[in-house]
Amino acid sequence: MRKFMTTTAVAALMLAATAARAAENVEVLHWWTSGGEAAALDVLKKDLESKGISWTDMPVAGGGGTEAMTVLRARVTAGNAPTAVQMLGFDILDWAKEGALGNLDEVAAKEGWDKVVPAALQQFSKYDGHWIAAPVNVHSTNWVWINKAALDKAGAKEPTTWEELIALLDKFKEQGITPIAHGGQPWQDATIFDAVVLSLGNDFYKQAFIDLDPAALGGDKMKEAFDRMTKLRSYVDDNFSGRDWNLASAMVIENKAGLQFMGDWAKGEFLKAKKVPGTDFVCMRFPGTQGSVTFNSDQFAMFKVSEDKVPAQLQMASAIESPAFQSAFNVVKGSVPARTDVPDTDFDACGKKGIKDLAEANTNGTLFGSMAHGHANPAAVKNAIYDVVTRQFNGELNSEEAVTELVAAVEAAK
């Protein structure tokens, strides 16, 4: 005797299948939209797909993630948070304080994250003792990227002091190329300022940007930092305003500019253009910052989701922290692994240098969260500094005025 399923039973099975597919899916909000960034993200997508987890992409263009955070706020307010969100530093802790993030303790304990993720990163990956985010990488921000052909034509070596840097920029100008490829956006201005302040001393950087000491923020050394920004401003082109960072990288890649001050995510653009470290471009620390590293760390903050979606979320977190993925992803991204036990075998010369520099800075106490990239202080303080730095860089304030404004702006934002 044939048995037929009722319409109700068929509908129930279809709903169950749909729910199962939804549970095996992760929706990911991020701002990795440049060529090099997208190539790196594809490593994670393919890794998850191999584990049977589908990926719903939610890219929001805009370096630094400001636009992405606006979209996220709207989603969370509507009660429809993504599974995971690319996030930086204090932004993660701000969401944790709101009670919006999930708990990764189960997978973190099972895989021993506490032992392999540097303590400097854990302060942003954990809240109230609980793991809330999975760190993907460590980017260091005090890098200089130099066109090797332009450097050779200048007959110069890699500059190690401020004076040597200025001499090199003058030689680039003589070649008829733009000395500094720069994008006039507040976070890019602040990235340069970050390195300039660090070049004036580790203690000074800590006092100014981590301790927020008014004496450091308002002293003669800070005036010198702003004076140096004025000098660097004279080496950018007239069309720098609003330029995206990856377009500035392209200027160096295409021999239209001599160098760029940018974090090591810039290397991904060089690699995507088939350029080779040491042959086509040079990677070095900003003069005066050798032995020190300012960092930011891309992390995926895991938001509270329905219970049926938690297993896929935990699998995503586990995949992110696996040593094999950490190596494969960071080789493409230009960053270094967010765990200390990943060998540097597959990394190029710049990657090996980045891993070595990070380890040494971590050991020597010269590893600092980057002010410009939200790892030194909360967003309100960072944005207050951005405002003063950009106004000074664009000639709206002289150095003396900028120092006075900086002290007042930071005090008001604290």
From Swiss-Prot:
Subcellular location: Periplasm
Pfam families assigned to the protein according to its UniProt record, in alphabetical order: SBP_bac_1
SUPFAM superfamilies from the UniProt entry: Periplasmic binding protein-like II
Keyword Ubl conjugation attached: no
InterPro entries, A to Z: Bact_solute-bd_prot1, SBP
Keywords: Periplasm, Signal, Sugar transport, Transport
GO cellular component, one term: periplasmic space
Main localisation: periplasm
Signal peptide (residue range): 1-22
Function: Part of a binding-protein-dependent transport system for a sugar.
Family, similarity comment: Belongs to the bacterial solute-binding protein 1 family.
PANTHER family (UniProt xref): ARABINOSE-BINDING PROTEIN-RELATED, BINDING PROTEIN COMPONENT OF ABC SUGAR TRANSPORTER-RELATED
The protein's name: Probable sugar-binding periplasmic protein
Lineage: Bacteria, Pseudomonadati, Pseudomonadota, Alphaproteobacteria, Hyphomicrobiales
